[in-house]
């Protein structure tokens, strides 16, 4: 049996996410927006809770199309609040809409959100060499810089810990444990 990070075992959806997505470098703006929203939703919750509702979030937020989400009105907020498959937190729903508008402004300024966000790690994946989760930080200098800049640009629910979780998910950092078979596979 191959070694993994261990956090995805026992839950098929978490295992699939660990094995196929987590830490894989993202260069698609729609997926960047999806991770920004979902990591914000996760604040105060477990990733497992959010991941098990991911399809409902995709449905509620027009597959995380930032152009569509940026146009949402109060009626859309109410529609999402009534969606039975998501965690109904008005502040987080309103943050997703606000973040979509800020996301589009970043795209316009930099040509893509991808180009902007990868700038925080010098354009290449930061490869960590953790042997246990106790070595892994909750935030880093890069996630603090990202958080500060995103907030300056109008984003919300983007504190340094949320930004670090986003960086892990979107592959800006490789935080697979060195014993995990994915540690080498996701390095790009």
List each model region and its residues.
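HhH-family (HhH-GPD) DNA N-glycosylase catalytic core used in base-excision repair
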Residues: 1-188
């Amino acid at each position: 049996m191959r070694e993994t990070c261990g956090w995805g075992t026992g839950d098929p959806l978490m295992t699939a996410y660990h094995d196929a997505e987590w830490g894989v470098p993202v260069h698609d703006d729609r997926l960047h927006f999806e991770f920004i929203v979902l990591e914000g939703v996760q604040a105060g919750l477990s990733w497992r809770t959010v991941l098990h509702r991911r399809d409902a979030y995709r449905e509620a937020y027009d597959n995380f199309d930032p152009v569509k989400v940026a146009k949402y009105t109060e009626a859309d907020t109410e529609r999402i609040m009534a969606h039975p498959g998501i965690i109904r937190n008005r502040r987080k729903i309103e943050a997703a809409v606000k973040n979509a508008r800020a996301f589009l402004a970043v795209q316009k300024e930099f040509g893509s959100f991808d180009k902007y966000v990868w700038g925080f790690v010098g354009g290449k994946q930061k490869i960590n060499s953790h042997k246990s989760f106790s070595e892994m930080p909750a935030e880093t200098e890069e996630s603090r810089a990202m958080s500060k800049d995103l907030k300056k640009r109008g984003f919300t629910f983007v504190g340094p810990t949320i930004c670090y979780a986003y960086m892990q998910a979107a592959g800006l950092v490789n935080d697979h444990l060195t014993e995990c078979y994915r540690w080498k596979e996701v390095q790009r």
